[in-house]
Amino acid sequence: MQKNTSQPTNTNEQSNQPSLNDQIVRRIEERQHLIDSGINPYPCSFNVTHHSATILTEFQDEAKTPVAVAGRIMTIRKMGKASFFNVQDSAGRIQIYLKKDDVGEAAYNMFKLLDIGDIVGVTGYTFRTKTGEISIHAESLELLTKSLRPIPIAKEKEVDGEKVVFDAFSDKELRYRQRYVDLIVNPEVRETFIKRTAIVAAMRNFFARHGWLEVETPILQPIYGGAAARPFTTHHNALDMQLYLRIANELYLKRLIVGGFDGVFEFAKDFRNEGIDRFHNPEFTQVELYVAYKDYNWMMNLVEELIYTTAMEVNKSDTTTFLGHEISVKPPFRRLTISDAIAEYTDKDIRNKSEEELRNIAKELGLELDPKIGNGKIIDEIFGEFVEPKLIQPTFITDYPTEMSPLAKEHAAQPGIVERFELIVGGKEVCNSFSELNDPVIQRERLESQAKLRLRGDEEAMVVDEDFLRAIEYGMPPCAGLGVGIDRLVMLLTGQESIRDVIFFPHLKPE
């Protein structure tokens, strides 16, 4: 059995360890000693010719390939006239063999002042050690950065018959606050973020192959809209006006559809002044796509293709493990109306019910409701509490009540219902889509109804955006819209259980 602890449990061993401040002071003194010796501990550049992964994959025993690598010292064994150390670069780690007779006395003496965490440049040639490890025989060594703060390196010891890991950088809160250290010492964290970039690239290429245009829309907006959420506010001094950080980019993208583009998309940073938990960060990333002359049924098929294609390109597999469940993203996905889903999981029929009847249903289910919310929010609360967590395999939830979706087109055959779907995976929403409402008269009525909900105290109800209404009064073609939460999709495809594990620098409480 192996235990993991950030501090030694043996008090004698702990007392023999130099304090963090002592280690920093020693490194600062070493820095000054290097400077006094005529060595610049922070030179401008180094000519790198190879990365560790390339060397390890392309190594040939007899070649003695000349190489120049740079990286951070992660392990070090200082001996008499020859030493070994490992450097870590962006691609991995490789061992360096350093011999005094080869690099010279000055360079070897400098090496004796180096610590784990220092960044060095090495030139030499490749070889295989007697133990079979591919390594670099150093011919020159240059200090590139003197590290003044020691990085946490896991150390294993046997205590009372058990293997114990000391000094592991495993505290979640500390890892989020010091992501730069997390990336150094935890290779799997680096891989998650490399995969995040690959996911975004795969999606961008997917949209580009369809011929749709990538665009940019304002982050600072005079009126916020496109979602039910509370905004962050700021003030523009020169114009003396209040502005909002966008909660969604939907209304600006629709303006571009009015302007004549058949398909536009944007990878956007959005901001919502709401709570923080495993699935929510106030600043998050989503991609929104709008395609003219399409509807939500067409968009469901596209989403299946998008997620399957992205998973295969990035993971080379159509299955992933998420929140303890093995999930298949191979199409087709299940499709279920929100009314049928609630009926299936609660035995309650919500169709054609008044607000009072919906409140009674919620009460029967043991759900306490805010008295300020209306029918749509009540249904949303019931669905979120009793249905959504149970939808593990990819499921399209369709046909929402109009009040829940003021920007969506009414269903062609069902009054009071709109053509909308959400994709739920692992019990969480991953994307949202509409057949977009393009009747300006009905759109105005919907937004004015939202304004009345705001007067009742619903802070997330939408506001009336006169410029958006003016835009669609010029005529917006039939259109399907889609919003995909990038952070949650990355969680799904990398198997992470917290949004903080897929955002480099998540928001945290003050230290």
Swiss-Prot record:
Protein's organism: Chlorobium chlorochromatii (strain CaD3)
Gene Ontology molecular functions: ATP binding; lysine-tRNA ligase activity; magnesium ion binding; tRNA binding
Family label: Belongs to the class-II aminoacyl-tRNA synthetase family.
Annotated binding of Mg(2+) 1, by residue: 422, 429
Protein name in the entry: Lysine--tRNA ligase
GO process annotations (BP): lysyl-tRNA aminoacylation
Subcellular location: Cytoplasm
Chief site of localization: cytoplasm
